[in-house]
Amino acid sequence: MRERIPGIIRQTAASIESIPVAEKQAYDALAQCIGENGPVEDHTDSTLLGELFRVKLARSCRQGLHWHAISWWLAENYEYFLLDALHASLKRPDQPDDLFWYLKKRGLEGALPLFADCAAPLVDAASQTTALTPALFRLALLRNLWGNKADLSMSGGVVSQKELKSDSANLLLLDDIDAVYEYYCRERVTAVTIMADNTGFEVLCDFLLAALLLHFNAALCITYVVKAAPVFVSDVTLPDVDITLNAMAASSSGCLLSSCSSLALQWIASTLREARQAGRFVPVASSFLCTAEPGWNMPLSLAELLDRQGQQGLLISKGDANYRRLLGDLHWPYDTAPKAVLEYLPCAVLVMRTMKSNVNIGISEEQQTRAAQFDAKWDCSGKVGMIQFYHWRVCNNHNNCRSRTRSPPASPPSCTPSPGPSSG
């Protein structure tokens, strides 16, 4: 809160073309208030998103709390609500509605040629087989996982090309790829919901995975859930979906791409557009994913979507913020069994994230030791990844079935709100 969040606010203001001095000062004032632990003020409105913040903000204001005293999860999400409101009040007619548009545009332009080189071999492999093989499934998930490193909210708006493309300096701590592939094939999954995370390189990886799944499974429908408002700098919103698809489809005009790479991008874009026309690829926006609410408080519309998927469904949760939401942003003991927390979900869940906060479950002491030997800040550095699969009808040994419960998990006494990244 002292450095990273104020830095993001100032970086965002600096990215706005021809920003007047008065506008820049308004952004600076918000950054200074948060960085210097100013009082929390209730600026919620009558919008759905404002209503979702109202109770928590009213409670904080009644208690006279300052920015560094409220939970990090609330502070971080509310900060983006205030940023959006500030942008809306200052926006000129020639400016985009998304205040992070300039940063996102730069990120997409840099990511396209790098992603195309990574995607071309997978698209080529898909053209040479009639079924989604375990090897191709694994490659697609790994590409998708490490694409999560491209998070502008953690980097202050800058992600290096080397970081986007390299997998060699990373550690895959939890690898449930074989388990989810077995479930996907055995249950003949027909419905997948993807909770999206970042634009740029990561959304390109999402689209690659979605295109491959749709290509090999004619009965499959994918719901792609994005944020209803711009948050966390690079998070995907509905306009970003078409912006990205258009950029991929127009890739032949880019002189930096080989014909093979360009064709791969065009195949992904055309596959998703055709699926979208047929109602098999459906992007939807969620205000709930822009709030500090825990997963077990998800609105009925989202809960019913997952409930309808049932035994033939799969929820894919992308990134750190969505994972924190599923766990209520509580600091569970790292070796907590996933079933103790995730039983409220009505369908199977696959988590793919690079670890950027100390909110984790399902990590044994042995795995924690291994991770610490790899990186002293392994749970916050973004260099350690997890592909974690859980289903309420499957125990850890993937044998015995049991009944599920839709009630919130019971927090153990040692379970506390997450203090946020060590970098502050």
Q: Residue spans of the language-model regions?
A:
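Residues at the starts of beta-strands that form the adenosine-phosphate
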Residues: T190-A191, A219-T223, A348
